[in-house]
Swiss-Prot record:
Alphabetical list of Gene3D superfamilies matching this protein: 2.30.42.10
Record key words, sorted: Cell membrane, Hydrolase, Membrane, Metal-binding, Metalloprotease, Protease, Transmembrane, Transmembrane helix, Zinc
Purpose: A probable intramembrane site-2 protease (S2P) that cleaves type-2 transmembrane proteins within their membrane-spanning domains. Degrades PbpB (PBP3, FtsI) under conditions of oxidatives stress; degradation is inhibited by Wag31-PbpB interaction. Also cleaves anti-sigma factors RskA, RslA and RslM. Site-1 proteases have not yet been identified in this organism. Regulated intramembrane proteolysis (RIP) occurs when an extracytoplasmic signal (possibly oxidative stress) triggers a concerted proteolytic cascade to transmit information and elicit cellular responses. The membrane-spanning regulatory substrate protein (includes anti-sigma factors RskA, RslA, RsmA, and PbpB) is first cut extracytoplasmically (site-1 protease, S1P), then within the membrane itself (site-2 protease, S2P, this entry), while cytoplasmic proteases finish degrading the regulatory protein, liberating the effector protein (ECF sigma factors SigK, SigL and SigM).
Residues the record lists as binding Zn(2+): H21, H25, D206
A single BP term in Gene Ontology: proteolysis
Family: Belongs to the peptidase M50B family.
Regulation affecting activity: Proteolysis is inhibited by Wag31; when Wag31 is non-functional oxidative stress increases proteolysis.
Cofactors: Zn(2+)
Name of the coding gene: rip1
Superkingdom assignment: Bacteria
Enzyme class label: hydrolase
The protein's name in its UniProt record: Zinc metalloprotease Rip1
Membrane topology, as annotated: Multi-pass membrane protein
Mutant lacking the gene: phenotype: Not essential. No degradation of PbpB (PBP3, FtsI) in the presence of mutant Wag31 upon H(2)O(2) exposure. Altered processing of anti-sigma factors RskA, RslA and RslM.
Length: 406
């Protein structure tokens, strides 16, 4: 029940984010003297609309049947758009370049503002996590190897454990167990569990790669939460670096913390976005039944499923944090300098400005607006790529969705 409610809530949150994105365009367009003819949430047949007068004429507001986005129709966005004679003085393509760029940037800027507001709220209510938690197999502590009595209870042991006796210390990063290279603590533990007896282990200390022989000790462990009895597995007596709890803030200290955290988050999101083109093969493999790579991109469908999981688990902080990340990503993607994205229109306006500055320096008159009809073939290519990628991600999210618990 809560899972379904969570899906609906997150889908609505995405729709509100898109609607506010379009509001950003509309508000700045009006403020800079451009006429907004229509503002709609959704696509397809109109369910409801109303027209309201303003100082530049009137604007039609409405809701359409397919809640997968929205649009803000500004008169004369390009020189090839149809425009009524009375709207020509307010046409967007006739305005100064800085005004056009401001209108185009206002949409993505609204997404960034939404993300910042959400991060600020999270900082005050729940605190902000450390984005640089150790992800590799770094040793937090060494100790003796105790058997596991029950799922909640460990047995007793004394003295140093196998890892400590072999010279491994807290802070060392284990990179190889026997012939198995390990990337994280879970992978290291899984490799050790399969072993028994002296094993060569490589680790990094102060940037240097070292190795030692550790006598892997057999012990009793419950290997899964639903196991009825413990199994005999190998252990070396090391534990992971504990996860740092979220840092707490008040309404004042949360302001600089929000910007600092968002800067770190932007770097991590940028790394993820840069990997998108390399994940096509992983998406195809996931659709075919392979394991879904947790770094593969998701669609609105996948995002809503994850939103549903967070609500079902009562993880409201994860719900809002995921929505904040999504808004940052939406804003960044819309600034890609390719048509039909906002960034593509900004690139065209910037090109016109630079071109006319050069012409003016040469004593020539300013040239006319860029002919968007000549740019349509390239625009269609971008649309085809985006549509294909969306189809791929939606299919993967339906047949093999990502989960926050995997």
């Amino acid at each position: 029940m809560m899972f379904g409610i969570g899906i609906v809530l997150f889908a609505l949150a995405i729709l509100v984010s898109v609607a506010l994105h379009e509001c950003g365009h509309m508000w700045v367009a009006r403020a800079t003297g451009m006429k907004v003819r229509r503002y709609f949430v959704g696509f397809g047949p109109t369910l409801w609309s109303t027209r309201r007068a303003n100082r530049l004429g009137s604007t039609e507001y409405g809701i359409k049947a397919i809640p997968l986005g929205g649009f803000c129709d500004i008169a004369g966005m390009t020189s090839v758009d149809e425009i009524a004679p009375e709207d020509r003085p307010y046409a967007m393509y006739k305005q100064k370049v800085w005004k056009r760029v401001a209108v185009l940037f206002a949409g993505p800027a609204m997404n960034f503002v939404i993300g910042l507001v959400l991060i600020y709220g999270i900082a005050i209510v729940w605190g902000l996590p450390n984005l640089h938690q150790p992800t590799t197999a770094i040793v937090g502590e060494t100790g003796c190897v105790a058997p596991q009595i029950t799922l909640e209870e460990m047995g007793e042991c004394t003295g140093p454990g196998p890892a400590a006796l072999a010279g491994i210390q807290a802070g060392d990063e284990i990179v190889k167990v026997g012939d198995t290279e390990v990337k994280d603590f879970a992978g290291m533990a899984a490799a050790v569990r399969k072993l028994d007896g002296p094993t060569r282990i490589e680790f990094k200390r102060d940037g240097r790669v070292m190795d030692t022989v550790v006598d892997v000790t057999p012990t009793q462990r419950f290997t899964s939460a639903d196991a009825s009895a413990p199994s005999t597995v190998g252990a070396i007596g090391v534990s992971a670096v504990p996860v740092q709890p979220p840092a707490q803030y008040n309404p004042i200290t949360a302001v600089p913390a929000t910007f600092a955290f968002t800067g770190d988050l932007a770097v991590e999101l940028g790394k993820s976005l840069a990997k998108i083109p390399t994940k096509i093969g992983a998406l195809v493999e996931a659709i075919g039944g392979g394991e879904r790579d947790k770094e593969t991109p998701i669609s609105v469908v996948g995002a809503s499923i994850i939103g549903g999981e967070t609500v079902d688990a009562g993880l409201w902080v994860a719900f809002w944090f995921f929505l904040a990340q999504l808004n940052f990503v939406l804003g960044a993607i819309n600034l890609v300098p390719l048509l039909p994205f906002d960034g593509g229109h900004i690139a065209v306006a910037t090109y016109e400005k630079i071109r006319n500055m050069i012409r003016s320096a040469r004593g020539m008159v300013a040239a006319g607006p860029v002919n968007y009809l000549k740019l349509m073939p390239a625009t269609y290519v971008v649309l085809a790529v985006v549509a294909g990628y969306m189809l791929l991600t939606v299919t993967a999210d339906l047949v093999n969705p990502l989960s926050i618990f995997q």
